């Protein structure tokens, strides 16, 4: 069947954005060309009228609570409280992102401090990139990397500090929990 959306044109669309410095915002601004070059610098041209949220959860809650709101989150953060928009007729699905028909996507990167040699951090990265780690990634709605192999880490003792985007926090917490179960020496 066909769907018809009736919008009360007397209500403005509420634009909801992430905070300046957010990786999700940076990717959105870049992917949609919401930046201009000023004096050789790329400048984020997100409207000053946007409601600014400071994490993914607040973005979802804000958009879900306002029928006229529009915002953005990563596919893995998407839940039933909001509806993903089609881009050029393509739905936001893992398959469409992988085949290139849904053109709005970005990779998540793992970064470590240059020159750092933390055995636990290195082993944790090995776990994340393993078949077991990428299964957790996929099970949580994110797109796994291809060509993985079984975890064969060294299981060193010690600790590592993990931080980053709120877009990745839920899956990262599950990866940490799973890693600690295969490497009880890690703190």
What is the predicted function of each stretch?
Residues 2-3, 7-187:
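Exported/periplasmic ABC-transporter solute-binding proteins
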């Amino acid at each position: 069947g066909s769907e018809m959306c009736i919008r009360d044109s007397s209500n403005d669309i509420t634009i909801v954005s992430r905070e300046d410095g957010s990786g999700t915002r940076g990717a959105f601004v870049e992917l949609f060309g919401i930046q201009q070059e000023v004096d050789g610098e790329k400048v984020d041209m997100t409207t000053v009228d946007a409601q600014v949220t400071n994490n993914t959860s607040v973005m979802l809650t804000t958009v879900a609570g306002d029928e006229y709101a529009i915002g953005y989150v990563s596919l893995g953060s998407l839940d039933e409280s909001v509806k993903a928009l089609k881009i050029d007729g393509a739905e936001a699905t893992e398959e469409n992102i992988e085949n290139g028909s849904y053109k709005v996507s970005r990779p998540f990167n793992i970064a470590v401090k240059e020159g750092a040699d933390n055995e636990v951090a290195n082993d944790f990265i090995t776990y994340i990139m393993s078949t077991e780690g990428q299964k957790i990634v996929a099970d949580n709605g994110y797109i796994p990397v291809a060509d993985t192999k079984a975890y064969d880490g060294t299981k060193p003792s010690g600790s590592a500090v993990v931080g980053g985007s709120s877009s990745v926090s839920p899956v990262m917490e599950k990866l940490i929990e799973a890693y600690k179960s295969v490497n009880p020496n890690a703190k």
